[in-house]
């Protein structure tokens, strides 16, 4: 897991490629949500044990979902047709190397397992592919399209 502030400069592509997935996080703008987050954080800072106890049921359910997914993961199937299409998306986007293909295959299987399925669906791939590929695209200073939008667009072309 890594984090960074894009205002501090970009990472070199060979370093970015080492990250399996890339999530873009934006600051929450809704004032009510911001207040709730600040209140929950303050409550946790004042009494972490109480906060953990109050959320114990949710934490246990999440823990069980993760351990169940780990057990299921080795038996999750990803059809050959989907693997070919994932590689076609990577090729169309001119992704260097094979790491993008590998990570997308693994992430789709993990997401299917997390949702209790033993077979990857189109929706599983759609959910993870942008996270796996957006940071692997070459930056073109003249292009105004967001890299995530570009991945989504190529995904739609290849899979539909």
Task: List each model region and its residues.
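Short, flexible active-site loop motifs that bind/organize anionic cofactors or intermediates
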Residues: 24, 73, 115
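Solvent-exposed alpha-helical segments within well-ordered globular domains of core cellular machineries
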Residues: 1, 13, 17, 32-40, ...
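C-terminal engagement/docking regions of AAA+ P-loop ATPases
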Residues: 87-99, 110-160
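Conserved AAA+ ATPase small/helical "lid" subdomain
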Residues: 49-104
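Short secondary-structure transition/capping segments
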Residues: 31-39, 73, 144-153
């Amino acid at each position: 897991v890594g984090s960074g502030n894009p205002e501090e400069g970009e990472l070199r592509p060979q370093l970015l490629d080492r990250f399996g997935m890339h999530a873009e996080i934006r600051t929450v703008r809704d004032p009510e949500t911001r207040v709730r987050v600040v209140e929950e954080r303050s409550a946790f800072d004042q009494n972490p044990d109480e906060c953990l106890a109050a959320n114990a049921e949710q934490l246990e359910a999440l823990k069980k979902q993760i351990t169940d997914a780990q057990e299921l993961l080795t038996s999750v199937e990803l059809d050959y047709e989907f693997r070919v299409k994932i590689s076609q998306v990577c090729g169309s986007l001119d992704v260097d190397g094979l790491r993008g293909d590998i990570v997308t295959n693994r992430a789709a299987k993990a997401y299917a397992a997390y949702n209790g399925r033993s077979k990857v669906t189109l929706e599983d791939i759609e959910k993870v592919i942008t996270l796996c590929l957006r940071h692997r695209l070459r930056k073109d200073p003249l292009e105004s399209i967001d890299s995530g939008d570009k991945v989504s667009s190529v995904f739609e072309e290849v899979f539909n």
